[in-house]
Regions:
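Short helix-coil boundary/hinge micro-motifs
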Residues: 1-138
Length: 139
């Protein structure tokens, strides 16, 4: 797992961010959703499944344009049954247990493309986000 910039990690999935502060994009290869997820919000459910869950997306107030694009991308992936590709964002300094409401633009991060996982949006109601990532066989 190599440390990358977010732009490099997105390029690993042939996805291009619309703007410098966007954390989701659609892959030009297969239309899958590519998302950058905070590592501390990933939970190991066992059996090779990791869950990314945000209880209240409305707390993401520092960057409403990127939040709205993320919501659009989540709706697309859920409605079109598209795969979700994972990029893990980790704080370089001290991870906060609760990241909601924090301006992520001010946090020093490193990114890791997690190509051995494929996800699915299992819940998205406008506020609650739940994506399950399964380990790909033979990875």
């Amino acid at each position: 797992m190599n440390k990358l910039t977010l732009t490099q990690a997105m390029a690993d999935y042939n996805a291009v961010r619309r703007g410098v502060y966007d954390y989701s994009a659609i892959s030009n290869d297969d239309g899958s959703l590519v998302v950058s997820c905070w590592g501390q919000l990933l939970k190991d459910l066992g059996n090779g499944v990791w869950r990314y869950e945000v209880i209240d997306l409305s707390k993401w107030t520092s960057n409403p344009g990127s939040r709205n694009l993320f919501k659009k991308h989540l709706s697309y992936a859920l409605n079109e049954d598209r795969a979700v590709r994972l990029i893990i964002a980790k704080e370089k300094d001290f991870p906060h247990p609760e990241i909601a409401g924090t301006d992520g633009r001010t946090i020093r991060k490193e990114y890791f493309a997690q190509k051995d996982r494929i996800g699915k949006v299992v819940v998205f109601d406008g506020k609650l986000v739940r994506i399950d990532f399964q380990k790909i066989a033979n990875s």
